[in-house]
Amino acid sequence: MLKSGGHGSASEIEFIDSQRAIIRNATYTTCSRVPGPSWLPEWILKAASFQVNEEDNTIQAKDLQLRFHDVPILAAPTLTFPLDTQRHSGFLAPLIGIDSVSGIEVSSPYYWNIAPHRDATLTTTVMSKRGLALDSEFRYLEPLHQGQGRFNWMPNDSLRKESRWGLSAQHSGEADTGVSALGLVGVDLNINRVSDDNYWRDFPRAGLSLTQRLLPASGSLHWSQGDLSMMAQVLQFQTLQDISSPITPPYNRSPQIQARYNKWNVQGFDAAITADTTRFEADFNQVPGGATGILRNGQRSFAALQ
């Protein structure tokens, strides 16, 4: 704690062993001390006790208060925070908000340091007018791939009288085919789905990808070897409709397959051939009072020489 330039006071320090100590009736602040008896730090932590554990580099505070100009702004019966800059599993500071529709929102996030390249955050939220909501976020970073996923779930929305959920997941990486002539194949996934058309309006803080009205879900494979490259993808949209402001659904690509051959600097010329075949699909019945007689499906194929 002193490495950060902080200082404090205590009524008693009990050294349990070389790695652990208990500091009772303790205060801590990083505000510079000004000489004189009337000095008051801008902010100060007060606790009934700080339990210092240098073995796992953590401090556990009991009956903690954070005071700003001697006015308490945050209190917790117990709170654990790290002594160093390394990531540690534990509860994060609670979040409190007020929404004119959902009411008072109180969130308690728990950070789980699974491994140096993986972590997760589990958050429990109580909304005074809607009820209980659970949020989970998982992140990973591997040598050949990386990604993240987030899932929100409200078992019973008291205002909508239904269960609500939202899913957002992204993955990018390469997979080994096991065939030396093929090598690695790139894999990309982007999935965004919600339970109902009102999700974007009711949960504006659920994440940018889940608060839009056009939610893409796509999966693609891409491969290249020398001058030849190929790509195959499926792209589908979930359109969140509003009867007062309807959206015409975009065409899905189910699937799109593309091949490209490049040849550079052939006697001073560059040449490329691109072949593409795509099947388009769209359901215009999703539009409230939607138009009829419009071609819903189509397909195109072409080859271009450049």
Model feature map: region roles:
Residues M1-Q306:
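Outer-membrane beta-barrel proteins and related beta-barrel translocases across Gram-negative bacteria
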